[in-house]
Amino acid sequence: MDLIKAVESQQMRKDLTPFNVGDTIRVHYKVIEGDRERIQPFEGIVIKKSGSGLRETFTVRRVSYGVGVERTFPLHSPRIEKIEVIRRGKVRRAKLYYLRKRVGKAATKIKELM
């Protein structure tokens, strides 16, 4: 095992819930405003997972007041408090960019995994 992989493996988090593209998740993210620190939940559909190891990221999309909001999180960030899987989704694509073109209820409609 080379030196970079050894250092990365120490910093990777093992306490996170596994999830896939198409799942509806709630990410509890630590936000620091001045000297205060609070936890801000962000709920939406996972439209993309990319990278591997310590550099792995995922993008969550939700529609808020008719406007699509996407947020990309580093998976192994210490600012992520926890990840809750609300619904498991069944999709046949690795990237769900087609949801960006949809409006209304169709933007959040994904088959549920039983």
Swiss-Prot record:
One of the GO BP terms on file: translation
Gene3D superfamilies per the UniProt record, alphabetical: 2.30.30.790
InterPro entries: Ribosomal_bL19, Ribosomal_bL19_CS, Ribosomal_bL19_sf, Translation_prot_SH3-like_sf
One of the record's GO molecular function terms: structural constituent of ribosome
Disulfide-linked positions: none
Keywords: Ribonucleoprotein, Ribosomal protein
A Gene Ontology cellular-component term: cytosolic large ribosomal subunit
Family matches, as Pfam families: Ribosomal_L19
Role: This protein is located at the 30S-50S ribosomal subunit interface and may play a role in the structure and function of the aminoacyl-tRNA binding site.
Matches recorded under HAMAP family: Ribosomal_bL19
Family, per entry: Belongs to the bacterial ribosomal protein bL19 family.
Stated name of the protein: Large ribosomal subunit protein bL19
UniProt organism field: Thermoanaerobacter pseudethanolicus (strain ATCC 33223 / 39E) (Clostridium thermohydrosulfuricum)
